[in-house]
């Protein structure tokens, strides 16, 4: 069974006793956005049909905006704010809620830093006195660390635990800080920039073996003929559902996986023809930040040893002379962290260590493979601010591999949408997100729950992504496509340019 089917089975088990209350604890966290949309639609239909109540536990604020009637915001074991969904998103009252919503990457925050919350959630075994959020609060005043806030009515049917709304302490409260908007960033070069990396017809097929003799009986077509241009100094995003081949493509570009066919050129040098020592100088210039900040760091090494791993791998005997402290400061960590071990750090701090390791060899090109997917919203904001700042200061070129379309809108300049091993649409973020052309891109964008969008048109796709071992004949998307035509079942659509920076593979646009 697929992930979506398994979740349906779990829902059926939960409904077997006809409950009055269904508690859905992160029911869609491990699912792709299109399957997530199906599950949310199913739960909502069941709620209406049976009259049961649903308690949704989630960290996805877009999902909350889309599905919930009322919202309770928790921090350090306390319900700090509770109100109608529209009221929370329109007029949040608790400083934690305010910062949480401001830390979500969206298109309208594209040219300014996200609101990151300093510090960490306190240990549940040693909560501080007074307000538990006070050590991290930008509005905290003298009373906050000393007195536990009361549960107050900030507005009709809007409850909040905060001294800012307590008449007894309001006179002592600090006024909200004046925020100075950042100047818009210069537009990223489009089309005219020098190509740092150029991929043509890249294929990565994995053999499927069977029997005692391990005969090859089929091939998994993980990447099946992809063209990709990454201009220097530009941030490119690869998006798509799980299993579409985006991570495999990223590894093939770095030559961590050898392409079955096609070519990958880095600054005009063909990488697929290089081996061993000839490839090593290019490995230094191309680095990767992995998805898992826990599994990607060796627990037996100190942070200083981890950061200089790349230097030692490239034969730099003077790796100890590299200023590890400065590198750690570059990614927002204290220099004293060099002597500590990974288990002493939070997920966000570990991801910063991974970024420092990648930067130690001074790369030109950085692949970020779901680099923030394992992090909380506020920690994600810190990492996105860091990547944005490093891109400006060091002139880095990024390839973001992600399913988080809010991140793409906030950070990327160009985007390529993948489906079952092939790119179906590509262009600037403004073009693709502003007016998606391919039916799959339209469904993908419609399925993403957003904190800043209401009344969106929903496009529910049937079924799951087909197997890359036996992809459908013709256009791979046709079994799920709401716009399917007879020719879609017969041949794969050719690439159709719509502008100098935009292409789509769909017969709807092929003359």
Language-model-detected regions and their locations in the chain:
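P-loop NTP-binding/switch modules centered on Walker-like glycine-rich loops
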Residues: 23, 27, 31-113, 367, ...
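Short catalytic/signature loops enriched in Gly
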Residues: 84-195, 208-213, 428-511
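Conserved ABC nucleotide-binding domain
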Residues: 90, 110, 321, 327-343, ...
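Conserved ABC transporter NBD signature motif
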Residues: 262-270, 282
